[in-house]
């Protein structure tokens, strides 16, 4: 059972997991682990499933998915019968007023919907993946010069599960720079998998870019793919100014992760998120929600 912290009620909730039995089998049983290494983590598997999710045939999955996970379709721009495929539904846009954004330049917002953890004063060679497992930022982006900027900084991890809104956004106004894709595998990013696969984020397909933020110094954006995520789509234009809350991109079907690195002395993450992260719990957040403040 995966428990996440509800910041509003200040209580823990059990996460509803899409494909829970499959994930537990593939990452916790000997046979499942073998199948994962031979098939499930491969690009071909995710590519083929992604192709299916682009077909009209996949539309039949939408209504049962919405019902099973209580997805509020009133927030969607499209009605449920207007989607052309499951991926069309999965990458749905929300109504303009569905996610209010705090315009205060000193407020840091969540870049998307999901479950968030944050770590302060990070050791670049031992960043927490999950309790007991770490990874290196240099391995994650394959760029020592960029990685060194974030020594003793802050790492914010936003895990999106298949039931979430899957578009991610800029946390401030500023100028985004070129995207750097890195080839990799397609392991699940569910906590069950994170406990099983060392340096999972460094193993998976991922993309990174620098963002010259107006208020939070230089921010490192990283998007990590996962099982069945055939594509990470970047919708922004490099070196073109963006506003706070503008869309950066989206993930096609599957769970996925956005990771942000902040320079030392740039931000302060809300105390409840830091506390829960130390305890080993994620906090449930939505795009636009306040998660921290600028260091003045």
Curated annotation (Swiss-Prot):
Required co-factors: pyruvate
Catalytic activity as recorded in UniProt: a 1,2-diacyl-sn-glycero-3-phospho-L-serine + H(+) = a 1,2-diacyl-sn-glycero-3-phosphoethanolamine + CO2
Cited PANTHER family: PHOSPHATIDYLSERINE DECARBOXYLASE (PTHR10067), PHOSPHATIDYLSERINE DECARBOXYLASE PROENZYME 2 (PTHR10067:SF17)
GO MF: phosphatidylserine decarboxylase activity
Cofactor note: Binds 1 pyruvoyl group covalently per subunit.
Keyword Lipid metabolism: yes
Pathway given in the UniProt record: Phospholipid metabolism; phosphatidylethanolamine biosynthesis; phosphatidylethanolamine from CDP-diacylglycerol: step 2/2
Pfam family for this entry, one: PS_Dcarbxylase
Pyruvic acid (Ser) carried by residues: 256
Subunit annotation: Heterodimer of a large membrane-associated beta subunit and a small pyruvoyl-containing alpha subunit.
Name of the molecule in the record: Phosphatidylserine decarboxylase proenzyme
Keywords for the protein's UniProt record, in alphabetical order: Cell membrane, Decarboxylase, Lipid biosynthesis, Lipid metabolism, Lyase, Membrane, Phospholipid biosynthesis, Phospholipid metabolism, Pyruvate, Zymogen
Its membrane topology: Peripheral membrane protein
Active site: 113 (charge relay system), 169 (charge relay system), 256 (charge relay system), 256 (schiff-base intermediate with substrate)
Organism of provenance: Clostridium beijerinckii (strain ATCC 51743 / NCIMB 8052) (Clostridium acetobutylicum)
Task of the protein: Catalyzes the formation of phosphatidylethanolamine (PtdEtn) from phosphatidylserine (PtdSer).
Main location: membrane
UniProt-listed NCBIfam families: PRK00723.1, PS_decarb
InterPro entries: PS_Dcarbxylase (IPR003817), PSD-B (IPR033177), PSD_type2_pro (IPR033179)
GO-annotated cellular components: plasma membrane
Similarity comment: family membership: Belongs to the phosphatidylserine decarboxylase family. PSD-B subfamily. Prokaryotic type II sub-subfamily.
PTM field: Is synthesized initially as an inactive proenzyme. Formation of the active enzyme involves a self-maturation process in which the active site pyruvoyl group is generated from an internal serine residue via an autocatalytic post-translational modification. Two non-identical subunits are generated from the proenzyme in this reaction, and the pyruvate is formed at the N-terminus of the alpha chain, which is derived from the carboxyl end of the proenzyme.
EC number, as in UniProt: 4.1.1.65
Annotated positions for site Cleavage (non-hydrolytic): 255-256
BP-aspect Gene Ontology terms: phosphatidylethanolamine biosynthetic process
Subcellular location: Cell membrane
